[in-house]
Amino acid sequence: MIGLPPLVLYLFKSELFNNLIIISVMANKKLIKDVKSIFTQEFVSNLLSTAFYGNSTMRMCRASTNPQSLKAAKAKYDCTEDINAHILLHNGVINVEDYNDCDYDGYPRARELNLDKLIYGFTLCMFNSPGSYASIMEGEDDMYDDLKVIQYALFGKIIYA
């Protein structure tokens, strides 16, 4: 039963996912009631580090964010992914530079990523790429699985296979 996609029942209660309720019963009987409860510091940090490590199409960089939040994150964490995860979890924004979409000067176009977009990307991955979703939830994910979440968050679909 390991290879089966998850059974997903969903209910949207608000327009910005503040009360997004998702009940997911997977092959290992894991039950998720609120998708936001998945997004812990460790989960977001692992997702970002796996998606962007060795990635030649996109990279993370910090956007202008609340200076106090950035200072608190830098005091608490050393790793860039941990700092960026902290920023996202505290209503901040990070930029993702897309090397395949350059502006007129040849510089990569930066796209904003916040927690709501990341949750939206995760939800789209759950419905459109159940194998990747199952891998992420079981801790067996790789760059391609996590990059799907980022692409769904930024574009609403998979752009780079």
Give names to the regions the model predicted.
Residues 2-8:
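Extreme N-terminal basic, low-complexity initiation segments
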Residues 46-53, 120, 148-157:
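Short, hydrophobic/amphipathic alpha-helical patches that form generic packing surfaces
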Residues 26-99:
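Long, contiguous N-terminal structural blocks used for assembly/anchoring
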Residues 135-160:
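Acidic, proline/glycine-rich low-complexity IDRs
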Residues 102-109, 113-117, 121, 129-132:
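Acidic, low-complexity, intrinsically disordered interaction modules
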Residues 30, 34-43, 109, 113-117, ...:
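Alpha-helix boundary/N-cap detector
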Residues 8-25:
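Short, Lys/Arg-enriched N-terminal segments with co-localized hydrophobic residues
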